[in-house]
Curated annotation (Swiss-Prot):
Its cofactor is pyridoxal 5'-phosphate. The lineage of its organism: Archaea, Thermoproteota, Thermoprotei, Desulfurococcales, Desulfurococcaceae. Gene3D superfamilies: 6.20.440.10, Aspartate Aminotransferase, domain 1 (3.90.1150.10), Type I PLP-dependent aspartate aminotransferase-like (Major domain) (3.40.640.10). The modification N6-(pyridoxal phosphate)lysine is found at K279. This is Probable glycine dehydrogenase (decarboxylating) subunit 2. The glycine cleavage system catalyzes the degradation of glycine. The P protein binds the alpha-amino group of glycine through its pyridoxal phosphate cofactor; CO(2) is released and the remaining methylamine moiety is then transferred to the lipoamide cofactor of the H protein. It holds the Pfam family GDC-P. Coiled coil: none annotated.
């Protein structure tokens, strides 16, 4: 029986009392004072009033966050089968290495000669990611997946700008099964988004694609395998069509876990690809990061006369090895690069996780990762495809790659029990829910992804719970609409929780809204 803790726990800012301390900074020794001249901060840079931080003891902090973890759920508690998120186990050895003081105490403004070990790690990671994706050069600069996408879009923009054709290259084509960040990234990059529909088989409708490709096409963004878990079989032909109008093909690496070691985006004809280190390569993610979204490119010549290559457009810094000096260096083509998109080199900690993950597994191990992930998903399909109330659009007997999208539309039509109700029913039994209502082309969608980390036994239990939910929905639908009862938080008012007037992602925003509402603080 699953029962989650339910604490009436205030926010950390609401805890504590004036004068309470968790840590007292010791006075420096006399010898230290003599050498550095004391540790007093100059008055001219002191705050005029103390920061608005809670004054709490160490034990209060420990108890507070322990209670919060008891009311939460993550990959350490159990599988998190969120589709297109690749929530795999985060190896502890990678945590140990990334937390080593020889890494986390480095400063980005240190002399390059003093961080040669770190630069060597980043240099090797660049090469490995280029090899895995079939690209030629990588920048580790972008901070996350959508950041990597935006980098790729800016590279496409710069490419056409350097070729003096940006005035007419105004459109980015995106399939209707794409991640929502794709059209957002393209729009932020100044392009018009042109949506192309999926065909009856779930892949891109080739005739529809041909009808929208033209002289205004700047590029196409695609995830392969798609959010439906289907491999885009026409990808080589798509590449030829886009390149035929001097467009660039962009690979969203969110679903790389479904093909890693078997095929590579570069071999399919892609010019640019981003990689989610926090998905495919075992770094933690969720709660806003930190993630890492390296972007890689083929070594495509842009302008022979000026000797400009696609690699010159990469953001931030790349690490290169100088054979003459035997040193690793950070380089950036300031003249043609799309520039810095964040401070310094990138999010180093998740990059160290990714480096460790690849180093541990090797090429054979990475291939096995994909094999196991694909096998897990297809085993799950075999268990649920005939359960009453669920459908698998685009062919329930077709093999998928890393994930599958179930539809609870038959269940909803028959009983009124929705995909959201199904998700709540899973939560009520201690299972994490899949991604729901996405992709938009599947009604009452339940996008489910079991990574290589999961066991047969757990997948079977998950399928059994989906069967139980179906049985209850058809016999007592009102009961199904009451879930969850066993979780820390029960049903919430979705509209109120997401409304701009009530949404407060931070304490400061919350206090500002309280002040405005009650005209006092």
């Amino acid at each position: 029986m699953f029962r989650q803790s339910r604490w009436d726990e205030p926010l950390i800012f609401e805890l504590g009392n004036k004068g309470r301390k968790g840590f007292i900074v010791p006075e420096p020794e006399e010898e230290v004072k003599r050498k550095v001249g004391g540790i007093r901060i100059p008055e001219k840079i002191l705050r005029k009033k103390p920061p608005n931080l809670p004054e709490v003891s160490e034990v209060e902090v420990i108890r507070h966050y322990t209670r919060l973890t008891e009311m939460s759920y993550g990959v350490d508690n159990g599988p998190v089968p969120l589709g297109s998120c690749t929530m795999k186990y985060n190896p502890r050895i990678a945590w140990e290495i990334s937390n080593d003081y020889r890494i986390n105490m480095l400063h980005p403004l240190q002399d390059e000669r003093t961080i040669q070990g770190l630069l060597e790690i980043l240099y090797e990671l660049q090469k490995w990611l280029a090899n895995i994706t079939g690209m030629d050069y990588c920048s580790l600069h972008p901070a996350a997946g959508a950041h990597g996408e935006f980098s790729g879009i800016l590279i496409i923009r710069k490419y056409h700008e350097l070729k003096k054709q940006l005035d007419r290259k105004s459109e980015i084509i995106i399939p209707d099964s794409a991640h929502g960040t794709n059209p957002a990234s393209a729009s932020m990059g100044g392009f018009k988004v042109v949506e192309v529909p999926s065909g009856e088989d779930g892949n891109i409708d080739m005739e529809a694609l041909k009808s929208v490709v033209g002289e205004s096409t700047a590029g196409l963004m695609i995830t392969n395998p798609s959010t439906l878990g289907l491999f885009e079989e026409n990808v080589v032909e798509i590449s030829k069509i886009i390149h035929g109008v001097d467009g660039l093909l962009y690979y969203d690496g969110a679903n790389l876990n479904g093909i890693m070691g078997y095929t590579r985006p570069g071999d399919m004809g892609f010019d640019i690809a981003h990689i989610n280190i926090h998905k495919t390569f075992g770094a933690p993610h969720g709660g806003g990061g930190p993630g890492a979204g390296p972007v890689c490119v083929k070594d495509k010549l842009i302008d022979e006369e000026r000797n400009i290559w696609l690699r010159d457009l990469l953001p931030g810094y790349r690490v290169v090895y100088d054979e003459k000096t035997g040193l690793y260096k950070l380089v950036n083509n300031e003249k043609y690069s799309i520039g810095l998109l964040k401070a310094f080199f990138g999010n180093i900690v998740p990059l160290i996780w990714g480096y460790t993950y690849i180093l541990m597994l090797g090429s054979k191990g990475l291939r096995t990762v994909t094999e196991q992930a694909v096998l897990n998903t297809n085993y799950f399909i075999s268990l649920v495809k005939d359960i009453r109330g669920y459908d698998i659009p685009y062919g329930k007997d077709r093999y998928r790659k890393h994930e599958v999208v179930l539809s609870a539309k038959p269940l909803y039509d028959d009983t009124g029990v929705s995909a959201e109700d199904v998700a709540k029913g899973l939560l009520d039994a201690g299972f994490y829910a899949p991604t729901i209502y996405f992709p938009l082309i599947v009604h009452e969608a339940l996008m489910t992804e079991f990574t290589e980390s999961e066991t047969i036994e757990y997948i079977e239990k998950y399928a059994e719970r989906l069967q139980e939910i179906s049985t209850i929905a058809y016999s007592d639908p009102e009961k199904a609409k009451e879930w969850p009862l066993n979780t820390s938080v029960r049903r919430v008012d979705n509209v109120r929780a997401n409304h701009p007037k009530t949404l407060a992602p931070t304490w400061r925003i919350y206090m500002e809204k309280v002040c405005r509402k009650y005209s006092e603080c």
